[in-house]
């Protein structure tokens, strides 16, 4: 009887002596990066040549330090993650996994792909679409990893490219562990991939941080106590209270889902113009010589999401609220030596900007005030002094508690946005792989492959650029709720967001 025999502990593949072993950089080996597997996808209303895309990515991962993106992921004896970079890539150990499906039908005849969101009706108001997870069968192959262990105990490469072709469109799926890269790292990879695709290898930037972690020298330059939010650090009993509230949230409302949200360009532009006007009038009434606060579309979108989320949840006005905005470190003067211009750092390089407020302020004050607070806190917290102090605090807290620092009271409600607009994912240019455009009804089959490629009045995006981008993923060990990414702005000027809530709240969101 073996009823009580435990499963044997999984074992990694045998070490390959010729592999180069490189420990993961500090921000790459964190609890949340280990927990998240991302599946990014793009719909192109053109027929793309999968082999051209595959061969360009394959060539990129043979160039200099870019080879590191094909490294195998392993645990060392101390429990830390490390890369094992093959001395050479072969058919048995490729730099990435590639799968393709040729459906032979129009995208409008495919039971899943035809539901990929579009603003086909020209809506001028926000619209909710289904969860991107519903497209999983289209985005990645069954062999694609969904958790870190799927890499640790196999010899699978880090990147998985899955391409589905139709007679008039193409869907490109791209999967990876968050330990490999963040959103802006994905953007830099995208640009280098396009350069190779277009025959511009000379434009592929040098790979930054192959061996050494460029961020590590900056850590501990400034004492953690100098961080502007240090006195609001969540710890001790406050942190235990925060965890208890999170547990109760998932006990009472165990089901959650994400929705893709369309925010029409004119709608967001009107909200922003009204906010700027409100702030200008407020500034004039204050009789100071300071300029009126600036707010971006991203600030407006986060403020709008916060208000809609609190309304949908029926949040008590007295509830403290933490608005967390993911902060990209590339380009910050505090890390000028870490990220020299012209070089590509692909790994994780993000912290967070935090706005501490209340549900009452978000629900009852004009949108302009919340957006201005988000912008003000971002500007303060990304100064060189605060970035250096936050990095020092981050490492101190990870070493002492095993988690990233959080700020605010224990009974707070936390909302988090990652703005991917700077990644320009809607501007990804695969035109060099385009065989035929598929904008016309019935177009895009083999007989049309020699027709001229051109943008027509029925489409806004240029040839070889996506009409939609989206993301889904697998969360292991924790769940992301009241959070998500702003996917960016499409060629029509419309904004797209993926947002996660408890299921019961979606009926009251809009």
Regions found by a protein language model. Give the residues of each.
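Flexible, P/S/T/G-rich "lid" or insertion loops adjacent to the active sites of thioester-utilizing
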Residues: 225-292
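Non-catalytic N-terminal regions of enzymes
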Residues: 1-221, 273, 297-317, 416-420, ...
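Helical lid/core segments from catalytic subdomains that handle acyl or acyl-like groups
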Residues: 279-286, 344-453
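Short Gly/Pro-enriched turn/cap motifs at secondary-structure boundaries
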Residues: 150-153, 251-252, 405-407
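Short, structured protein-protein interaction patches enriched in aromatics and acidic/basic residues
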Residues: 71-91, 325-333, 391-418
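Acyl/amide activation-and-transfer machinery of modular secondary-metabolite enzymes
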Residues: 33-42, 80-119, 252-258, 329-373
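Hydrophobic "lid/gating" helix adjacent to the active-site nucleophile
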Residues: 65, 283-338
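Eukaryotic cytosolic low-complexity regulatory segments
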Residues: 241-244, 375, 379-382, 386-393, ...
